[in-house]
Amino acid sequence: MNLMQFSGLLVVWLLSTLFIATLTWFEFRRVRFNFNVFFSLLFLLTFFFGFPLTSVLVFRFDVGVAPPEILLQALLSAACFYGVYYVTYKTRLRKRVVDVTRKPLFTMNRVETHLTWVILMGIALVSVGIFFMHNGFLLFRLHSYSQIFSSEVSGVALKRFFYFFIPAMLVVYFLRQDSKAWLFFLVSTVAFGLLTYMIVGGTRANIIIAFAIFLFIGIIRGWISLWMLAAAGVLGIVGMFWLALKRYGLNVSGDEAFYTFLYLTRDTFSPWENLALLLQNYHNIDFQGLAPIVRDFYVFIPTWLWPGRPSIVLNSANYFTWEVLNNHSGLAISPTLIGSLVVMGGALFIPLGAIVVGLIIKWFDWLYELGNREPNRYKAAILHSFCFGAIFNMIVLAREGLDSFVSRVVFFLVVFGASLLVAKLLFWLFDSAGLIHKRTTSLPQAQVERKL
């Protein structure tokens, strides 16, 4: 890539970034936070943050990248996707009906709400405990990160339950919503994330998500400003780089450290070159249709329930890694949201996928607003916990693709819903046994004397 080609790409990148950032800023000024703001920032991070890092790698370290015309296609496809997404998100098919009393789908009381977060926390802690008993601290046992996906590690399915610690702590926060509860959420979830980082052998997802939710709650409540958010973002990038060095066992300094920082940061936060790599191999893709969405559910079905379950799950990430790139290193390469749509149906699926994603984010915002208007604080805490807990699934949506998102959000919905049902069942049993007593608020002595 020469300077003229880079200049052309830079113009497209600047215009695309300005387009998305401007729309996001207007939305932020209007509502301060909703899931459209979050997804827009996540989209910017995934598809545009990596371009400056790639440019430095090319001109400073002479790293090979996809041809400029392919990089241009990647930038334009991302900008067009966001345009279709935004129009879909903002389009209202029916008039908004205000102040209509509807029968609630469910209600929550104090005991049921506390039982729910205890059950969610129990699911996470028991899963971590069983995994630890089988494998110990994998971070200190394994020699390479890819080994955590090998047969040496048992109970891999348990890792899917670790994340439910975060929704549990979200319920605790939303019941109080003060600065102490906010800081407690950060300390508890990051500590749990560091524990799972050592046990699993280098998975940083729980730490990133806990920190991101902490920051967005701070923005919503006005406890942190935009410059503090930017400073925290820089701190987060440095922290993730340090954890990545520990995960891969790297000891670098000087130019090598700078080079390592650039490519690890790009791969961690902005795998946009994976989309370019996919577009470069467009002619090698045998479009999979909706099959990757169905196949991604296979990992949630235990072998004792389905003895003939395929050992290899050919979702869009694995198809891209194994079939398109012929890479069998043991690690799946993230195709990104747009890449997963290309694997499923080519360029035609990009605008269709943008429409689907727009409707998904619209639904999460509807649920979030429902929680904001809910007079029952216990039910509001559950609704908000579900919405913010699904942030992990939105990160999966942007990085891994639509197929991975669908399976994980269904799994999250099933476990979260089952926890609610169990909490309600336990409350009914305790109430039937006479163990539940209504709280009585005692009047101050002065009021008692007046009444007498």
Swiss-Prot record:
Any one Gene Ontology cellular component term annotated for this protein: plasma membrane
The protein's annotated pathway: Bacterial outer membrane biogenesis; enterobacterial common antigen biosynthesis
TM ranges: 6-26, 37-57, 63-83, 118-138, 155-175, 181-201, 207-227, 228-248, 341-361, 378-398, 410-430
Pfam families per record: WzyE (PF06899)
Family: Belongs to the WzyE family.
Membrane topology per record: Multi-pass membrane protein
Subcellular location: Cell inner membrane
Entry keyword set: Cell inner membrane, Cell membrane, Membrane, Transmembrane, Transmembrane helix
Classification via InterPro entries: WzyE (IPR010691)
Keyword Lipoprotein tagged: no
Subunit structure: Probably part of a complex composed of WzxE, WzyE and WzzE.
The name this protein goes by in its record: Probable ECA polymerase
